Amino acid sequence: MKKIAFIAFLMAVCVATGRAQESRQDISISGSGLIEPFVASSTNIQVHSNTGYGLLASYRFMLTPSSALEANYGITYHNKIHYYGNPFNFQVLTRNQEISAAYVRTFNFRKFNPFVEAGPGVMIFMPIANSSTWVMGAKQQTNIGGMYGAGIAYEISPSFDIRAEYRGFVTKVPNFGNPGNYKLDTNKYYNIYNPVLGVAYHF
């Protein structure tokens, strides 16, 4: 009886290991921060914002054991973008959405799996019309850009790992359609910092 139980246990371990090796897809959910840098431009418009917080959902399909394609959707709330000019000073409360795709290169070291990634995407800036937006007529804006990142995944089981990553998104500074006849153009691109921490499930 003990031998049968032991053999059954070994078979279960082998099946789990085999499934882990055959896993070619994973999904992950992460908490994220959105940090937009200070921007000074030749148009005399200065832009600054607070840190926004949100979620990032990702899907990866493994092409080989060390390379994958990834699709991302992220949303961030309560990101206040401040515009300083002469003679105005106001802010726009925004909800940001990221839609992007990337090529991922993974380096396998037992349970630790560092990775790098890069690809195209869009950042959608959606103004929220409430008391935190100080100008009327701000319009939704969709800007094309590119994302990149580097991080590490730590395997906690054959099916799950913890992922930490520094991501960046390069896109044009929004002007929200120059609301209220104010010229908010900076003619600048900026690098939005986006650290994330989450859990991935392999299947």
Report residues per predicted region:
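Gram-negative (and chloroplast) outer-membrane scaffold detector with strong preference
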Residues: 22, 31, 58-132, 154, ...
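Surface-exposed strand-loop-strand hairpins of Gram-negative outer-membrane beta-barrel proteins
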Residues: 33-56, 141-142
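Short sequence motifs at beta-strands and strand-loop junctions characteristic
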Residues: 47-52, 93-98, 140-145, 187-191
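Outer-membrane beta-barrel translocator domains and adjoining extracellular loop/strand segments
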Residues: 39-46, 81-88, 126-135, 175-182
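A charged, solvent-exposed segment within the mature domains of Sec-exported extracytoplasmic proteins
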Residues: 125-168
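Cleavable N-terminal export/targeting peptides
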Residues: 1-24
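Predominantly the C-terminal beta-signal and adjacent terminal strand-loop region
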Residues: 78-82, 157-203
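Alpha-helical transmembrane segments
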Residues: 4-8, 146, 193
